[in-house]
Structures are given as C-alpha cells and as structure tokens.
Amino acid sequence: MRIEDVRKEIDKVDSEIIRQIAKRQDLAGKIARLKFAQGLPVHDEKRTRAVLDDIFNRAVEAKIDPVSVQKIFEILVAMSEERQRECQGDGNLP
C-alpha cells in the first residue's frame, strides 16, 4: 500500500466525520425546538457532564487519547448549544 492510498482513506474518514457533525447539528436544532417548547434552557450542565464523561470512557476503551477526544467533544457540545441558541433566535451563527 502506498502513502497516497492511505491518505485517500483518511480523506474518506474525514468526509464521514463532517457528515456526522452536520447530522449532529441538525439534531441540535430538533433539541432546541423541544427545549423551547418545554421552557428549558439551552445549557444543561448535568447532560454536558454526562456526555463528556461517557466520551472520555469510550475513548479509553478505544485506546485513544481520552483528553484529546474530550476536547473535541467540548467543541461539539459548544457548537450544539450555539445551534440551539440560533434556532431560538439568540445565536451568533451566520
């Protein structure tokens, strides 16, 4: 196998990651509508902590750097909350 072949595989994985992030953002919009209808705030510290703890543990199980993976998910959670604010008319997204 050549390095170019492996890079093409990485590019495919990267494209799938982007698609999954977009799907996650769409789901965040659905969550926003449900939270708004129920009078719930965008930020839910208990849920955020549970997500990040779970991600940390899954990264350990997968034998990848859990701290780095947790940082990535901190960004994803922040993106989700911003999307939720945007759906409720309070966000800063373009």
What is each model feature region?
Residues 1-94:
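Domain-level signature for soluble enzymes in the chorismate/prephenate branch of the shikimate pathway
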